[in-house]
Design a protein with these regions (language model features):
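Short amphipathic alpha-helices in soluble, non-transmembrane regions
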Residues: 180-184, 221-227
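C-terminal, non-catalytic macromolecule-binding modules
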Residues: 109-159
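Cytosolic Rossmann-like ligand/nucleotide-binding regulatory domains
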Residues: 187-206
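Short amphipathic alpha-helix segments
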Residues: 139, 143, 173-192
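Single conserved hydrophobic/aromatic residue that forms the stacking wall/gate
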Residues: 230-237
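Short glycine-/aliphatic-rich beta-strand segments at the starts of folded cytosolic domains
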Residues: 158-170
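Substrate-binding/catalytic subdomain of NAD(P)-dependent oxidoreductase enzymes
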Residues: 1-92, 97-99
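Conserved active-site and cofactor/substrate-binding residues in soluble primary-metabolism enzymes
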Residues: 13-21, 46-50, 97, 117, ...
Length: 237
């Protein structure tokens, strides 16, 4: 989703800029009013160099994505870092470039990509708006009057299913891995992949777990338990 603002990068780093974009795109895509409901929003402030290195080893890249879809006639929106394949289209959108991927029936998948910042794109957008005003062909921001757009119920975020990435910094001792997996199973989170890297010098180990899909509710409850447990010195997920 492009560069962070040099003066105040907070809105870019905490995901709010992407959040604003996905709300506008949802309104355009689904012909709805801009949602005022809460959505899952997580930025990239907590991602560490270690996470980037691990993703690279797995053939993956970390990308901050805004996702919107209609589930059972309800609107689901989320913004959070995702692990994507290095070989995927979205995995190769870098630098100042932005990309929007749409999927529908029967049209399938469409991709739009372009620069999201810089003097060229910014001045082009401003000039386009000014010319529209001068020509007198101003249209409503969403094509039709906002009041004519329909409202839609929000999807319960806690019921959304997704995979989970966890990285633990633990004491290298017997039973720690078993303790962590037991906590995961308590919330019906099944493990898809485990990587354990020992640090013999400091008598510690790094454990990386990627789960199968599970609900946001299970993920949230499990993380709350892991953050407060003595199973790990540091938890990132």
């Amino acid at each position: 989703l492009g560069y962070a603002e040099p003066g105040n990068p907070k809105l870019d780093l905490n995901g709010f800029d992407a959040f604003a974009k996905i709300r506008i795109l949802s309104a355009l895509s689904f012909n709805i009013k801009i949602s005022k409901s809460k959505c899952i929003m997580e930025g990239i402030e907590n991602i560490k160099l270690e996470d980037i290195k691990i993703a690279n080893q797995l053939g993956l890249r970390i990308k901050l994505l805004g996702i919107s879809e209609i589930i059972n006639n309800q609107l689901f929106e989320t913004v959070h870092p995702c692990l994507v394949s290095k070989n995927s289209y979205i995995g190769n959108v870098n630098g100042v470039m932005n990309a929007v991927i749409t999927e529908g029936k029967p049209v399938g998948q469409s991709i739009l990509q372009g620069e999201g910042a810089g003097p060229g794109p910014t001045s082009s957008s401003l000039l386009s708006d000014l010319l529209s005003i001068l020509r007198g062909n101003i249209k409503p921001p969403f094509g039709i009057s906002y009041n004519k757009r329909k409202s839609i119920k929000p999807f319960n975020n806690q019921n959304y299913s997704n995979s989970l990435y966890l990285r633990f910094e633990v004491k290298d001792k017997q039973g720690v891995l078993s303790l962590i997996t037991n906590r995961l199973s308590k919330f019906k989170i099944s493990v898809k992949r485990i990587i354990q890297t020992p640090d013999k010098k400091n008598k510690k180990a790094t454990i990386v777990i990627i789960s199968h899909k599970t609900t946001e509710k299970n993920i949230k409850n499990c993380l709350c338990l892991l953050y407060t447990s003595d199973a790990a010195d540091d938890v990132n997920g």
